[in-house]
Structures are given as C-alpha cells and as structure tokens.
Amino acid sequence: MDFNDKLATLTRVCLARRVSAGRFVKLTRHLMENEGASEVNPKALFGANTFDLLFFAYVHKLAFEDSLLPPYKLLAYLKVCAYGRLPQLLMYLGKQLQEMDTDVDLGANAGYSYLIQVLVSFMKDAFASGGGMRKRYGTSIAKGFGFFAEVLLTRLGDRMAGVTAPEITSQLAELAKVDATIAGRLGEAWMGLKGAAKTSTTAETVAATVATPTTLTRLYRDTLFESLMFGDSSWNQYGSLFQLISTVYAMPGYPTLASQPVQSRLAIIGEVICAMFDCQSITFLRRDSAKRNNYWKSCIRTRIPRIIRTLFPHSTPEEKTLIQSVVSKSVLGLDQPTVTLIRLSIGSDELDDMFSSFPGGLDVDIRHELVAACISEGVLPKDAFNAIFKDSGISVEALDYADELTIDGQAMSLDTMAEQLSYENLEIGSVSDCLMSKVVAQMEKLSGNAQEALTKRLLVCLADFVQAGNVRPVRYMCQALALNTTAVDIMALCVDPMLLLKALVDCIELWREEEDEANYQEAYTDFGAIVVFAITLKQRYHLDLALLNQFGTLFVGAPSPSSTMPSHELFLSQLLTESDSSQRIFHLSDEQNDQLSGWATALYDAGGISDDLMRSSSVKQFFLVTPAIFQQSMLAHEKGLLSLSTFKGGLEYFLQPFLLGSTVGVFKWLSEQLWVHSQKGHDEQMSTVISVCSTLILTDNTDIEVLSPIHQMVLAICADEMYEALDMALRAGYMVENRVFEFLEPFVSAINYNLNVQRTVSSSGFRSQKGIGMSGGGGSGTKEQTWKYGASMIATIKEQVSSLISWSQNQYTGPPFGYELVMILSSVDTLGHKYVLEQLIEEIALADSNGTGHYTVEVVATIATVAFIISTSVKSPRPFSDSQLILKSLDNMVNDSTGKSKDICVLLQSKILQLLTTAGYKPDGSRLDGKPHAKEDYSFVVNRTGEVENKPINDSSQNSNTDNQFMDTNMFGGDDFTMDFGGDIDMPDLF
C-alpha cells in the first residue's frame, strides 16, 4: 500500500471509531512522517468514501488549522471531483471559517493570496457555468466562504504576495457580472476597511523638528501599565507588577528601588497612584468588563500600599510624614473628570460633585479606601485619614472596611473560620446562609493584607477538604464564589488562579462514589457544582490545564493527581475536548449504550430516576454520556417514537440541581444544532430544538434571583453562546420567544461589557455602544466583539491618535481618552503593519506642518512600543503577532526613504527604541525573555509537604491549548488558527 491507500484506510478507521479531529490530524502527521509525504492528497482523503460531520471536521482541520492539506488543492479537488458532496461540505467549512476568531493572525504567507484568487475564481466560474446545479454549488460557496473571503481581503493589505489592489478590483469586477451582491460586499470590505487612499506628502514637503523627551510621559506610563491587562494569569500577581515598576523606574547606580534616594522613591509613589487611577478611569470610559474594573480597584486598594511598603521597608516617622504628603497630594490632586468618573461609578450624583468643597462629596469611594489601606499596611500614620480628608466630613469609621473578618457582627479569626468551615453542618440551610457565603461576601470589605491572608487560608482549606475527601464544603465554596465574581477577581490578585483550579481538578480526579451512598442526588449536585466552577475559572482567567503540574502539590505529604497525571488524562480535559456530539454519540461502548438506555427509560417512563440507576454508573460516566442522551432523544422524536410533550417532560429532570451541572455540554450541543438546522432553510425539526432550549433555559419563575445556584452557574458560562445561536435562528425566520432572550440578557451583559445588552426593533442582534474590544464566555474577557465602527479601520485609528494628541497638547488634563489599544493591535493585524505605520507616519508629517509634530511622535511611538511589547511577550489567546513586525518595517522605511521622510522615520525609530529600552527590552531584537515577570512565592501552600519542590513536571501528553478548549471553541475545532505553507507555493493553473 502506498501513502494514499494508507491515508484512505486511516480515514475510514478513524471515522468508524469516531476519533476526534485533533487526534486524526496527529495520526495523519505521524503517517506522513513514516511515509515521507509532505502533504495530504485530497483524492486519498476523499477515497474513504464516507461522508458525515466528523469527516467535515477532518477536512477543516487538515486544510485550515494544521495546513497538511493546501486549501487551494482542496478547492480544486472539490470543484472537479466532489459535486455530490459540495454543498454540505462547503456550508460546514464556511460556518467554521465564519466563526473563526476574527483577530487570529493570518501571517505574511503567499498561500493566502492564492486562496483569495481561488475563492474568487471558484465562485465566478461556478456562477458563470451553464446549468442550475453548478450555479447552486456556486451559491453555496458564496454563502459559505463569503465571510472568510471578506476577512482575508480586508486583512492582507500589503502582504498580498503579488496580488495588488488593482488585481483584486479586476477580479471583483468579473465576479460582479455574475453576482453583484457578493462582489459588492467583498469590494466594500476591501476599500472600506482599508480606508480611502491619500496622496503621501511626507517625503518631500514636511520638516520634522521634533523634540524627544527623556522622561516618561503620562500617556506612555498609562498605556504601559494597562498592558498588564493583556497578560496571562501570572501577570495578576504582585511580583510581575513590581517587576514592571522596577524596570520602568530603575536608576543607574542603584540596584533596587528601595536603595534610591528618598525623593526618587516618593516620586515613584505619586506616579504609580496617578497611573492606576488613570487606568481605572479608562475602564470606565470604555465601559469595560466588571473583571477589569475589579482588577484596577483591587490594585489601588492592595497593590499601592504594598508598593509603598517595598519602597520604604523600614520607614521612619519622618518618612511616613513625607509619604503622607505625597499620597495626599496625589489623591486630592486628581483631575476633576477623573473624580467625576469615580463618583459616577458608585452611583453618586454628578451635581453633588460639582458643588462639593472636597472633590467627591460625602460618599466613600476608592480614594478613601486607598488611604485606609495604607494605614492598615502601616505605611501611613493612624491619623493620616482625618488629616487628608479633614474638609470632606468623612471619618475612617464611615468606611465599610476592616482589617479582620467579621461574621454576623462578630470578629472571627482565620483559625476559627477554618475550624468552623470543617465542622459546619451543610445538610440544613441554603447556600446563602452557610458560613462560606458569608466569608466570601466579606472579601471586598477587607483591607489588602486581610484579603490576601483570607485568600491563602481559603486555598489551604480547599486543599485540605479535597485531600480529606470532604466534598460538600468544596461544593459550597464553588457555589459561593461562582455567585460572587468580584470576590473571585480579588482572590485571583492574591494567589494565582491556577492554584484554585488545581485544587478543583484534584477533587474531580479523586472523586469516588461511596457504595453505601445514602443520597445520590446530593452527590451528583456536589460533583456538578465543582465541575462547573472549574470550567468558569478556566475560561475567566484563560487557564491551561497542561500547566497545572508546574505548581507542585497542594496536599500535605503526598502528591496530588494534577501534579503527576498527564493533562490529557484529566477528566476535565476529557470533558472539554470530547464533549463534541459527533465524536461520541454514534459510537458508544456497550457500557455507555447500557447507561444511555437506562437513563432514557427513566426520563421518559413513569418510573423516574432511581437510586439504582444512579448507582449503576459513576457521575463521571454520566457527564460524558449526557450529550448522547439528548442526541438519541432528538432522533427518537424525529422518527415519531417520542412525542414532544414526553420529550420535554423528561428534559425537565435536567432542571433539577443534581443534573444541571451536566448540561454545560448539552448547551454546547444545542447551539451546534441551532446552527445546523438554521442552514437548512425551512426545517420542521428547528422548532423542536428551540423548544428544548427554552425548556432548559426558562423556569416557572422568571426571577433570576430564585434560580438554584447551580443553574445560575451554568447559565453564566453558556448564556452568550446560546443567545447568539437563538438570535441566529430568529434572523433565519424561526420563532423564538422574546422572554428567552430577556431571561438570558442579564447573564450576557455580565459576561461581556458593563453595558446592557438590548434588542432593537429593527434588528434582532446586539445593540452595542462599543466597537471591537475584549469580552468573553464565562466572563473571560477574550471573545471579540464584531467591528461596529462606521468609518474605516485606519480612520478610526487616526481618530484615536488625534484624541490622544489633543489630550497631550492640553498638558494631560482630565482622564486619558478611552482609547482601544486592543482595537489598534487588531487593526495592525488586519491591515498589515506596514500600511498602518505608513499612515501614522503621514499623520506625523502633517501634524508637524501644523506645529504639533512632537505630540504626534509621542503618541505614535507610545502606541507602537506598547503594541510591540504586548505582541512579543504576552501569552494570551490572541498574541497580535503582526505587531512584532513594526520595528522591522520601520527599519526598512529608514533604509529606503530619503530627505525629510527619512528624518521622521529615524526620529520615530529612536523614540520607540528609547521607550523599549525604558521598558526593559533590548533594541537589537534580542529582547529580554518575555514579559517582566517575577516568580511568585507559593510556599504558604507547597511547604506543607516538607519535600515537594515547586518545579515543573514533564508532561508528555503533547496536549495543546486547542485540545483543552470547550466553551471557547467552535464546533469540532479550537481557537488557534494557524497555517504554515512552508514557503512559496507554485500556483497551478486550476482554471
């Protein structure tokens, strides 16, 4: 057998065994290495002579994610040899490409320009062919690939590798002859997002007489601090923040900040205070997610006092007086617009602020909490609060702020809390009445030191509960935290959230059902709450299960499962990667089929769910088979074997708390079904899918506050995905009750921005007050909004640059303009670094002719520098890799330009390199390894073993982020969209 025969056999076997797409690609790559093959032949792949959704997933992953099958060859084969399969496959591939993360870097690769040509020519050829069938195929291609072609056209810019704008225009003109609508959309996207071309006037006519400041500007300081928001979970930790401060404010001849002269350290305190208040103001202006607001609020309350303590580790009374003066000046000297934003954020009346003698009126806000936190830290004298706020009429007693935990009006030590948590009777009372909920509710009211102490103690308690097999308090902790995300965000600043996830993963791995279990429903509820909160943590903080083993063990004297097991063997990893319905439902083991049969009988017969049934299979097995239950039930209903009323009646069992945790995977499956049926035009089964969704979402009581805790936790994860899927069904002409959207809207608003999600009369989609930004499923803060700006991308960038220039010209009065740094980064990836850089340099030249060139250089250099820092150092789901090429492109422009244009490029380059050097990056390209990062001290946990070292443990699982994705992934595929064509490709004459 040659390679093609072996590949066809491998494909058939994998499909028969329902092997996942990711695993199939790994097996294919291994086969190619053994056979010496360089790419997949589509003829061999389609030689398997089998066709279903899983095969579609194989094709998509090979062609558009792992690049083993060149896309243009796939399209060529489909055009010639796969007529019977073309519509379904193209619709599937088109949907996958349409749901692709729109900010994934497409790279400067010739293959994409070829793909553009193939797509346009393919559509044109299909439309132009005689015969209705070929034209229908062309329509499918246009619908399926239209969005993807739009994205490619708008992104490639100067990276088109030989495909110039006139060539694209010519191709679109040809396409317009057969379908003006499609051609119009693509042409509008190409010209609109790229922006109207302007005649360059930079080279000969403009003189660049720009001063180069040697000190940090407020703009650069603020953008650099805000870049902390783009990092992974470790950036939340104090060590990373102080490392950044130490680098930015380093002084030659002084090895540490604490060794610098007193006046220098005092100046740093003032700078940091102003920067953090600026950053919080920016989040208010942009209406950012609650997680970001929580981050900066907690930074002000907890990080600033620690920074002062680090700068003055043994402060004298005289030094405390000087510190008080700096803090007072910084707090009382905030710009009035900044103060107004702070006041409005707590619901204060703007008119009260305007006429108050002290900036801020009579309500307590974050400024008062900062001073109280500094007193608690011991860096300010005890009478500092009254001295600073003597004219405000507010005393320290007015703050709902404490240095110790207070429960039911009584002070409680952490030792007492830990003891009572261990022995509390959780069989009676609700979650809101338990001690854990009361403790979590106090988190926001504590001082920074108290928050950190409480967080670490709760983590130790959690680890102890898990090691002892005491799962009930673990469940109550999960529910209490899931319903108070502000407390979770605070805890994530005190310890790495990976530690919290690690404890929960250990609990899940150690889960065993007792043979004499008296209450199986409670056991299922316990497990479901723990799993759902673990998924919430993973999504909210972008955590990677493959990194769990780098944190040692949380157990006393024993290794924990997550410290020793390969990540792909963890149950949570299996649940997140194998929940895809098509991978599992049609190929269940005999044991799973028996379980499915038993559960189906219990759900739809009069007997109901018995303890014997729940005893017959483990809760883990039930979670893995739950999507299959829904799939088989749907098939039975379609075949007339199960009435709709009986179907819905059985599904109502899943609204019981003990089964709700398993519906996370079901919601994922249902959202896929909504899309599948939406693509079929009028589909009788669509009403059934929508009805099932409504059954699982709505309850008899529409008051969200009376939902069970586990129901709220599940909806907090799944609401945004279900909302979009149902909204798509509504746009396709199907009936969806408005109350379903009304019920989901509070969850969607909480997940995304702090703005209300509303539905307009004219459109069923979101009405957003923002453009592109960072938000996400489960409150993760990563899922991108679509582009909402009416102007072109480049016009929007210039508008933001202009606003920042105006702020700089006005001596930085007022809070910074609510700029979208992530939007600027995305625009660079979309339009190409060279094109954006040319446009910004043109702005410098034009501004210089108006006498504002030095302000423009400062703004452009700041944006370029921070973009470069983020793109080269941040481990995030979206690394903005094209921004890494900014400096290289600027180098080329310096070498190629002449005259005044060269002067501008040289000046901008020197300013960027100056800022990069200030930020701790080497200008020669051999940058320091990654972001400023300091190893955190986890000894409060790991030293309990006496032997365990905090060292990474090798994980041979070859598990990638894409294998760990679940709620953040598309159907059958992950977020990481990468293609490597391995150099130039000779384009065959396909047409």
Curated annotation (Swiss-Prot):
Stored PANTHER family: MEDIATOR OF RNA POLYMERASE II TRANSCRIPTION SUBUNIT 5
GO molecular function: transcription coregulator activity
Record protein name field: Mediator of RNA polymerase II transcription subunit 5
Family classification: Belongs to the Mediator complex subunit 5 family.
GO aspect biological process, one term: regulation of transcription by RNA polymerase II
Described function: Component of the Mediator complex, a coactivator involved in the regulated transcription of nearly all RNA polymerase II-dependent genes. Mediator functions as a bridge to convey information from gene-specific regulatory proteins to the basal RNA polymerase II transcription machinery. Mediator is recruited to promoters by direct interactions with regulatory proteins and serves as a scaffold for the assembly of a functional preinitiation complex with RNA polymerase II and the general transcription factors.
Membrane-traversing stretches: none
Keywords of the record: Activator, Nucleus, Transcription, Transcription regulation
InterPro entries, sorted: Mediator_Med5_fun
Coiled coil spans: none
GO cellular component, one term: mediator complex
Organism: Yarrowia lipolytica (strain CLIB 122 / E 150)
Name of the coding gene: NUT1
